[in-house]
C-alpha cells in the first residue's frame, strides 16, 4: 500500500496530512500542524521560510516514526509570494508577504503606464495589489538583477527538497503574468518590468513528477525516501480538486483566511463584463479554469479574536453572534481598509460610524456583522457569476476551514437561494493527495477522485429559505455610497 503526504501550508497555519486509499475510500491522518505568519524584519513583513522548511522536516520525521520508509509527497501553499534565487542556488532574502504595504498604489501606478484592459485581455486575472506582477514592479532592482530565478513559495519548497526548479501552472497563473491564450509567461508584460522571462523556471502542469528528495536531507534528517509530485500547488486549486462536486451548474467557495468563490470552467472568460467585475481566470488542474472572485474571508474574524486576546474560541464567537439580529450592521468586507489594519475591531467600528450605522460593541455583535456581511457578499457574487457566464448555479460547495461555520453556511444558503453543501474542511490537502494518486495510477481522474471524496467524508447540507435579500442588498448599496 502506498503512503501519500500532503504538505499544505496556508497563510496562518500549515499541516502534513498522511493519506492512503483503502477500499475506494480516502483515509487521512494529521501528522503535524504548525503556525505560520509573517514578522516585520528588514523593513518589510516577511515569511519565516526557513522555519517552514524545518516544520516540514519535523513532520516527515514523524511520518518515518510510524514505520513508513517510502512515500509520495505533494506541496501546496498560498499564492503570489515568491523567493529570489541567486546564481549559486541560494535564497537572496526571506520572501515578503503579500500583506506588506509596499504595493500600495502599485496597481494604479503600473496601469497608468500600461492600460488595465490590455493587461486583463492578456492575462484574464483580476487586479489586486498583492499580485506578483505588482510585487515585482516595486521589488528592489539590485535583488532582481542578482536573481537567477524567481520561484513561487511551493515551487521553492519543492526546489529545496529535490533540487529541481519548476513553475507550476495553477499557481503561476495567479501572478498576473501568464498569457491566457499562449499559456506562457508574457514577454511583453515582463519586458515592461525589465525582467527577463528566463528568470522563471519552466512551466509545469499539476500532476507532473518532480523528483526524489535529495540524499543530503535523508542523511541530515530521519525522514522517508519520498517521490515528490508537483500537485496543484496553489491552495485554492487543490481545494477545488478536493471539492465533492457532482453534476453541472455548481459553484465552489474555498473558505479560509480568504474566500474564493467561483466556477470550474473548461474555457476562460475575459470579456468586458468579466473585466468590469474584476473576475479572474486562474488555471486549474487538468485543463480547467477557476473563474472566481477573491473576497476577504475569515481573516477579519481571526483578527477580531486576536484583538480580544483569544479569550473566546471561534465556536464561542459564533454562538455569541447568534444572539443578535442579522444584518443590523453591514460592512464591505473587500474594502482595502480591512486588509491589514492595526486594530481590526476599531476599524470595523469606525467603518460603521462613518457609514451611518449603529456601532457594534460586543464580540458577538462584531462577529455577527462579519458573518452576515460575508454571506451577503457571497450571494451578490453568485448573482454576478450567473450573469457573466450565462450558467444557472443550483448548488454551492463550501470547502476549507469556513465550511465548519454553520451560521455562515446557513446565511449563505438563505441569501443565495440555493442548496449549500459544506465540507470537507481539509479539501486542500485532499485535493493535493488526489493529484498525487492520479499521478501514481491509483485514481483514474479528477471526476473519479471527487466520487471517492463524496464516499469518504461527511458533507453538511443547508437548505435555502426566505430572507429579505433585495432589502438587504439595497441597504448594502446605500452603505457603499458613503465610501
UniProtKB/Swiss-Prot annotation:
Q: In which residues is substrate bound?
A: 79, 234-236, 294
Identify which cofactors the protein needs according to its UniProt entry. Answer: Mg(2+)
Q: By its UniProt entry, which InterPro entries does this protein fall under?
A: ATPase_NBD (IPR043129), FGGY_C (IPR018485), FGGY_N (IPR018484), Rhamnulokinase (IPR013449)
Top-rank taxon of the source lineage equals: Bacteria
**Class of enzymatic activity (EC top level):** transferase
To which pathway does this protein belong?
A: Carbohydrate degradation; L-rhamnose degradation; glycerone phosphate from L-rhamnose: step 2/3
The record's GO CC annotations read: cytosol
Stated EC number for the protein is 2.7.1.5
Keyword match Kinase: yes
Sites where the protein binds ATP: 11-15, 257, 302, 401
What is the disulfide pattern of this chain?
A: 352-369
Provide the active-site residues from the annotation.
235
One GO term of the biological process aspect: glycerol metabolic process
Keywords (alphabetical) are: ATP-binding, Disulfide bond, Kinase, Magnesium, Nucleotide-binding, Rhamnose metabolism, Transferase
- Catalysed conversion reaction: L-rhamnulose + ATP = L-rhamnulose 1-phosphate + ADP + H(+)
The record describes the protein's role as: Involved in the catabolism of L-rhamnose (6-deoxy-L-mannose). Catalyzes the transfer of the gamma-phosphate group from ATP to the 1-hydroxyl group of L-rhamnulose to yield L-rhamnulose 1-phosphate.
**Family (UniProt):** Belongs to the rhamnulokinase family.
* Protein name per Swiss-Prot or TrEMBL: Rhamnulokinase
The protein's organism comes out as Listeria innocua serovar 6a (strain ATCC BAA-680 / CLIP 11262)
Gene designation: rhaB
Amino acid at each position: 500500500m502506498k503512503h501519500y503526504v500532503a504538505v499544505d501550508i496556508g497563510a496562518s497555519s500549515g499541516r502534513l496530512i498522511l493519506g492512503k486509499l483503502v477500499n475506494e475510500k480516502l483515509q487521512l491522518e494529521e501528522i503535524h500542524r504548525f503556525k505560520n505568519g509573517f514578522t516585520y524584519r528588514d523593513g518589510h513583513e516577511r515569511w519565516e521560510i526557513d522555519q517552514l522548511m524545518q516544520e516540514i522536516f519535523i513532520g516527515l520525521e514523524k511520518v518515518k516514526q510510524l514505520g513508513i520508509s517510502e512515500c509520495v509527497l505533494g506541496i501546496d501553499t498560498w499564492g503570489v509570494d515568491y523567493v529570489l534565487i541567486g546564481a549559486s542556488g541560494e535564497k537572496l532574502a526571506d520572501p515578503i508577504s503579500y500583506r506588506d504595504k509596499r504595493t500600495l498604489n502599485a496597481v494604479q501606478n503600473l496601469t497608468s503606464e500600461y492600460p488595465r484592459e490590455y493587461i486583463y485581455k492578456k492575462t484574464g486575472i483580476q487586479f489586486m495589489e498583492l499580485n506578483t506582477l505588482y510585487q515585482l514592479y516595486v521589488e528592489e532592482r539590485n535583488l532582481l538583477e542578482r536573481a537567477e530565478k524567481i520561484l513561487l513559495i511551493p515551487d521553492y519548497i519543492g526546489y529545496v527538497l529535490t533540487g529541481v526548479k519548476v513553475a507550476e501552472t495553477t499557481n503561476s497563473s495567479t501572478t498576473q503574468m501568464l498569457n491566457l491564450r499562449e499559456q506562457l509567461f508574457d514577454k511583453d508584460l515582463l519586458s515592461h518590468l525589465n525582467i527577463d522571462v528566463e528568470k522563471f523556471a519552466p512551466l509545469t502542469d499539476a500532476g507532473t513528477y518532480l523528483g526524489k528528495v535529495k540524499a543530503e536531507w535523508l542523511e541530515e534528517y530521519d525522514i522517508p525516501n519520498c517521490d515528490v509530485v508537483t500537485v496543484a500547488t496553489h491552495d485554492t486549486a487543490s481545494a477545488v480538486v478536493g471539492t465533492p462536486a457532482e453534476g453541472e451548474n455548481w459553484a465552489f467557495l474555498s473558505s479560509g483566511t480568504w474566500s474564493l468563490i467561483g466556477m470550474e470552467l473548461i474555457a476562460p472568460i475575459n470579456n468586458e463584463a468579466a473585466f468590469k467585475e474584476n473576475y479572474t481566470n486562474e488555471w486549474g488542474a487538468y485543463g480547467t479554469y477557476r473563474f472566481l472572485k477573491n473576497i476577504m474571508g475569515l481573516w477579519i474574524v481571526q483578527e477580531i479574536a486576536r484583538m480580544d486576546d483569544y479569550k473566546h474560541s471561534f465556536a464561542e464567537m459564533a454562538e455569541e453572534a447568534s444572539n443578535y439580529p442579522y444584518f443590523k450592521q453591514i460592512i464591505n468586507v473587500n474594502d482595502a481598509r480591512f486588509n491589514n489594519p492595526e486594530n481590526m475591531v476599531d476599524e470595523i467600528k469606525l467603518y460603521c460610524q462613518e457609514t451611518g450605522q449603529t456601532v457594534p460593541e460586543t464580540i458577538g455583535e462584531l462577529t455577527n456583522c462579519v458573518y452576515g456581511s460575508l454571506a451577503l457578499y457571497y450571494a451578490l457574487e453568485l448573482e454576478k457569476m450567473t450573469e457573466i457566464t450565462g450558467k444557472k448555479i443550483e448548488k454551492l460547495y463550501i470547502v476549507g476551514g469556513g465550511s465548519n461555520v454553520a451560521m455562515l453556511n446557513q446565511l449563505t444558503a438563505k441569501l443565495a437561494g440555493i442548496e449549500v453543501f459544506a465540507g470537507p474542511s481539509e479539501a486542500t490537502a485532499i485535493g493535493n493527495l488526489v493529484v498525487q494518486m492520479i499521478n501514481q495510477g491509483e485514481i483514474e481522474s479528477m471526476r473519479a477522485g471527487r466520487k471517492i471524496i463524496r464516499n469518504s467524508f461527511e458533507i453538511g447540507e443547508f437548505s435555502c429559505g426566505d430572507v429579505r435579500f433585495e432589502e438587504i442588498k439595497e441597504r448594502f448599496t446605500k452603505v457603499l455610497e458613503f465610501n
